[in-house]
Amino acid sequence: MKIDAVITWVDGDDPKHKLKRQAYGSHRILHTDDVAGSTRFRSVGEIFYCVASLNRFAPWINKIYIVTDEQNPQLDSFLSENFPEGHIPVETIDHKVIFRGYEQYLPTFNSISIESMTWRIPGLSEHFIEFNDDLILAAPVTPEDFFTENGVVCYAGKRNSYLVALTRMLKYHRNGTKRITYKHTMLNAAKLLKNHPYILKMHHTPKALLRSFYENYFAENPETLHKNIEHRFRNVHQFNPQELQYLKLYQEGRCELRSVEDNLLYLYAKDSDTYITKKLEHFSSLEGCKFGCFNSIDQASENGCRMIIDWIKERIGLKE
């Protein structure tokens, strides 16, 4: 079984990208954190650690595709220095490639839109694993951690979709609109399947996916694809394409649910240095934990950011 990795990445500090974002986004959109706040685009080198972790802990990956917008992470010298005996091939894929035939929706600054199109990468294997650039592998993994004989592994738990929707209704609105949360996009996916009675509450882990699912589903439902990618910034009406695949495959008995407990190191870096120190000390005791998500490292203090990056480098075994 050939398995590829797909990483969606943007260097939001690139002046050209900043100008492009400002040209298409209103002041309200650009200052709404869950839609287009600056931390959604800012980079502190996460892509290097994500790619390095794949080489260290999943050398069986066939190829790494980095999906981006007219940018290049410049990984060659970093990989040559840290993996002198060879590394997994890396190819950068521009948004124009996966949006071919849908150019009217570019440029896009919307991770949901982009993730709805990654299956269109030319040459992508049937089995692929999707990463955000704030994810790393934190221990050795095998293909069986992601795929079964006839389907996929999903690190999630079932939640009653009606209760989740009710909870959302009781929460505050912000900036005159409903806040767009991870759960909200999952609920929208469930609605596509005739108001599915539950969602699979995914965690911040890599997502194992089948290319043919999207190819077939969107061939049968082309308008659904158009509606999900037409928004340049995140929109309350969008659905999570990964959740859609998992719900449908689960109905068919082709999606195996596994607990994320003891398998995920999650750190929300906005918190204090004391919190970060305690979290990293705890993480160090979990040697077999497979996945790491370091959310919004750019929001940590300078010292907190350094602690996180030093810990990641040590975990992966990188040179200074």
Q: Which residues are covered by each model-predicted region?
A:
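A solvent-exposed, charged loop/short amphipathic helix patch at secondary-structure junctions
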Residues: 12-40, 155
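Short catalytic/ligand-binding loop motif for oxyanion handling, primarily in non-cytosolic enzymes
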Residues: 13-17, 63, 72-77, 100-101, ...
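Active-site-proximal specificity loops/subdomain of glycosyltransferases
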Residues: 33-38, 42, 74-124
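Short, acidic, metal-binding catalytic loop of nucleotide-sugar glycosyltransferases
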Residues: 53-61
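GT-A fold catalytic core of metal-dependent nucleotide-sugar glycosyltransferases
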Residues: 72-73, 117-158
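Long, charge-rich alpha-helical interaction segments
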Residues: 153-236
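A glycosyltransferase accessory/donor-loop signature
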Residues: 200-320
